[in-house]
Amino acid sequence: ADYPMRRFDKTLDVNFRAPFQVLQNSIPLLRRGVEENPDGGAKVIALASMAGVYSEAGLAVYGATKAAMLSLVETLNAEESGNGISGTSIAPGYVDTDMSDWTKDKIPADTMIRVGDIVELAASVLRLSSRAVVPRLVVTRAGAGLGA
């Protein structure tokens, strides 16, 4: 795939390096949160993408960074869920946002996933006890197959 390295670096920085650094720097705070609320634990919600689960032409770099986010959260669970810290990646298909404007000639906005649906999923995960770990949620549009 033809992809300028400058754009590659920016995509990697925004979609993976920055979230990795935030997570890494947050671990001490999350551990304190577990001490204060052992039953609720501490939770991390990461926004991934369906492109990190299923490949799509033209989205190689974007999809790779989102797949890295999925792996990061699953590794967080392997390392910290026994200590009460867990993470969930939400990997939606096309959501009706400015980022999906480029698809609206093929996918009408009124068929896309609503932002509110993603917010509600995150809120639901946050209400779970520390004993429940949901590594990833893959969300697709109604009437669309997986990967759409």
Language model segments and positions:
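Substrate-binding pocket helix/loop in short-chain dehydrogenase/reductase
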Residues: 1-9
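Active-site helix of classical SDR
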Residues: 23, 65
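Residue(s) in the substrate-gating loop at a strand-loop-helix junction
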Residues: 49
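Active-site-adjacent segment of SDR/Rossmann-fold oxidoreductases
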Residues: 54, 75-85
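Active-site loop immediately N-terminal to the catalytic Tyr-X3-Lys motif
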Residues: 54-60
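C-terminal helical subdomain
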Residues: 82, 89-90, 97, 105-148
